[in-house]
């Protein structure tokens, strides 16, 4: 099965910049919101299509957003690169919230949580055991003062704890990665995989994960 990994941090903390040391063919970037990288690179970047990549216009926003998730799953499956980065993955939740803001009731929040969770689960179920998918995701401060994965409020948090869907969660701050919870974040990683504080070099992280689990390079 493939491996989803969460990279979380505030805007400008160095999440996307951590991709800089990858070369073309080593990683592909699926961008939810932006269309460019913050450095010169020949890394392949594709943007999630506003129409979900379907031929017929979706009948409603719920269907449209499911199509976007399906498109992302297809891109991951078809990618020849051993590593994938979903940049600004929190906007999958945010954009769907705004798309469906006119809908009443709580069911839409359950559906939003399910869409995001199902994407993570689909990666876990992919047959390619050498593929790693990084979710580059913004953070927010919780009621205890810790940095947590940004969602769209308590109604979704009651349905889904995003960090719980990942075995590896790295917290990015001031262009460094923190690999374990130190009281200020919900970071976590397997014992002995990383030092507590490491440079925000996702290429080096990728190599460490592959060595730890005995994964190939695709």
Name each model feature, range by range.
Residues 24, 33-37, 89-91, 139-143, ...:
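Conserved nucleotide-binding/hydrolysis micro-motifs of P-loop NTPases
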Residues 142-218:
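Conserved GTP-binding G-domain of TRAFAC-class P-loop NTPases and closely related GTPase folds
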């Amino acid at each position: 099965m493939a491996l989803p990994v969460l990279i979380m941090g505030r805007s400008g903390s160095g999440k996307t910049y951590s991709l800089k040391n990858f070369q073309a063919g080593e990683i592909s970037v699926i961008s939810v919101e932006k269309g460019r990288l913050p450095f010169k690179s020949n890394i392949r970047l594709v943007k999630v299509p506003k129409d979900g990549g379907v031929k017929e216009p979706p009948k409603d926003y719920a269907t449209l957003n499911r199509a976007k998730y399906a498109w992302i799953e297809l891109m991951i499956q078809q990618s020849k690169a051993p590593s994938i980065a979903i940049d600004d993955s929190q906007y999958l939740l945010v954009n769907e919230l705004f798309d469906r803001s006119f809908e009443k009731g709580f069911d839409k929040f359950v559906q939003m949580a399910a869409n995001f969770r199902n994407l993570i689960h689909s990666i876990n179920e992919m047959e390619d055991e050498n593929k790693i998918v990084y979710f580059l995701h913004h953070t927010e401060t919780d009621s205890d003062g810790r940095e947590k994965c940004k969602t769209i409020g308590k109604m979704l948090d009651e349905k889904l704890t995003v960090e719980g869907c990942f075995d590896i969660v790295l917290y990015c701050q001031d262009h460094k990665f923190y690999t374990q919870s130190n009281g200020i974040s919900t970071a976590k990683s397997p014992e002995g995989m990383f030092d507590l504080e490491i440079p925000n070099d996702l290429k080096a992280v990728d190599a460490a994960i592959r060595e730890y689990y005995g994964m190939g390079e695709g």
